[in-house]
Amino acid sequence: MTTRLGTADDLPAFNRLMTATGARDQFAIHQPQYYAAALELFAPDNAALLLAEYEGRPLAGVMVFTWGQSAAYLYGASSEMPAYAAQWAAMRWARARGCRSYDLWGVPDADEATLEAGFTERQDGLWPVYRFKRGFGGEVRRTVGAADRVYNGLLARLYAWRRGRQA
């Protein structure tokens, strides 16, 4: 297993991994051009695509973004275990840029006692993701969280209706 810093040429492989991961773990992913735009807008100094490969074949990839002394893992894809190698490479990349914190972005919405009591057993929601992230150590820090900014209310309601949700 090797890890390396990816380039824009690696985005098709990253997108294939994202598609497989989204299907396996049942979550929506962005269009390929979204990831390309994110990398283009923030790289080379404030974003990186890191890949874990075996015999030249990408098995996992992560996109990490930095600002100041902080780094955040926002997008990741894998064919199971190589995600650890890609994540560790991303942490080392961020540390080499002077980052003092690395945000793994998202855990189940539960207090720490519940997190500790349930992380080995629970399989629903974000629990498997938490188990993966917990393996790196660190501490849970709560922040406000992410939200979508709606620029066109009518389109947002139509989109929500189409997806079968309430706006």
What are the residue ranges of the model-derived segments?
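A conserved beta-strand-loop-helix scaffold within acyl/acetyltransferase catalytic domains
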Residues: 1-81, 92-96, 148
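A structural signal for short, well-ordered beta-strand segments and their strand-loop junctions
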Residues: 4-6, 51, 101-104, 142
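Short secondary-structure transition/capping segments
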Residues: 16-17, 114-117, 153-157
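Generic preference for well-ordered secondary structure
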Residues: 19-22, 36, 86, 116-117, ...
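Hydrophobic alpha-helical segments
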Residues: 24, 114-117, 151, 162
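A short, terminal or domain-edge coil/loop segment
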Residues: 55-65, 81-82, 101-105, 155-167
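Acyl-donor binding region in acyl/amide transferases
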Residues: 65-138
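Short hairpin/turn module used for nucleic-acid contact or packing/dimerization
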Residues: 122-167
